[in-house]
A protein has these predicted regions:
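Active-site beta-to-alpha loop of glycosyltransferases that engages the nucleotide-sugar donor
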Residues: 8-19, 39
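Short, acidic, metal-binding catalytic loop of nucleotide-sugar glycosyltransferases
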Residues: 22-31
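Active-site-proximal specificity loops/subdomain of glycosyltransferases
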Residues: 41-91, 98-102
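Short, high-confidence coil segments that cap the C-terminus of an alpha-helix
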Residues: 30, 85, 116-119
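Short internal beta-strands
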Residues: 34-37
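Cell-envelope/extracellular polymer assembly enzymes that use nucleotide-activated donors
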Residues: 3-5
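Catalytic-site signature of metal-activated, phosphate-bearing donor transferases
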Residues: 67-72, 101-279
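Short, hydrophobic/aromatic alpha-helical segments in well-folded domains
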Residues: 20-23, 73-77, 109-110
Length: 279
């Protein structure tokens, strides 16, 4: 079995930090989780006991500049970890790399079986979980998230180079590596929960600090997608996840050869019940 670690950086998000440490800790062991806090004003919560934690000086700048500074910190740290680990999973705090339960393998078992010859990273198909505001109420924070959310968009934005096996530089937000193509693996998904609850999104939109750093445009796009989702047709998961992997493995933007594309398709799928207890 390959030795695998996970790392992230967080600021003012205790809810998803708790979910992140519980999910990856159960799979990898909390001693293999590395958590950076963006700002020395942050409090390290009890849920991170047993993990490596570090308070960093606040990363300054607008959203683009600060994202680049943060990913540079984590890329350098991941390169050092690869002297002791075979793979490093890097995600935002609201992202979870999940193996299809139908395969009957844990995340470490699945990744240990991936042929990495010629690649520096592994990518999971991006699954942007979105609240259907006509059918789904606000999240109960004490229950599994996927037991309360059934719809998602298959998104190239969240098909990220999330798993490193060589010491290379991540692009901002883990979206790519700066040297190398995508290696998208069927049966592996990155679930993103930034659009999973309208009230959570509203809190971010009201956050003065995020607004001053230029997050408004991105957050308004999320809200627009949440309003559009109930009007889009819902496709079958097993059919369209396979098609999405095929498309994203082959199609690239002409201006960014190492970013996957999907011909502008907006594919909404229903998440199968087999995922409901995982996060």
């Amino acid at each position: 079995m390959k030795k695998i670690a996970a790392l992230t950086m967080v600021r003012n998000d205790g809810f998803f930090l708790g979910k992140w440490t519980a999910y990856y800790g159960a799979l990898l062991g909390k001693e293999n989780l590395y958590i950076f806090f963006d700002g020395e004003d942050q409090t390290v919560p009890e849920c991170t006991r047993g993990c490596f934690t570090k308070l960093l000086p606040r990363v300054e700048g607008n959203v683009q500049a600060s994202d680049k500074k943060r990913i540079d910190i984590m890329s350098e740290f991941a390169s050092g970890l690869l002297e002791r680990y075979d793979m490093i999973i890097g995600t935002d705090i609201d992202e979870f790399v999940i193996v299809d339960p139908a395969l009957g393998k844990s995340l470490p078992e699945f990744l240990s079986g991936v042929d990495m010859d010629g690649f520096n990273s592994v990518s999971a198909l991006g699954v942007d979980v979105i609240q259907n505001i006509r059918k789904e109420i606000g999240l109960d924070t004490d229950k599994p998230l996927l037991s309360q959310r059934r719809f998602a968009r298959l998104s190239t934005r969240y098909t990220k180079s999330s798993v490193l096996c060589k010491p290379v530089q991540w692009g901002s937000g883990f979206h790519r590596t700066r040297k190398g193509n995508y290696h998208i693996i069927p049966g592996l998904y990155l679930f993103h929960f930034g659009c999973a609850d309208m009230s959570f999104l509203g809190l971010k939109m009201d956050d003065k600090d995020l607004s001053e750093r230029g997050w408004n445009h991105h957050l308004f796009k999320r809200r627009r997608m949440m309003k559009q989702l109930p009007c889009l047709p819902v496709r079958k998961w097993d059919t369209w996840t396979k098609r999405a992997v095929w498309l994203q493995a082959r199609i690239r933007h002409f201006y960014a050869w190492n970013k996957p594309a999907m011909l502008g398709l907006r594919i909404v799928v229903e998440i199968p019940d087999r995922f409901s207890s995982l996060v």
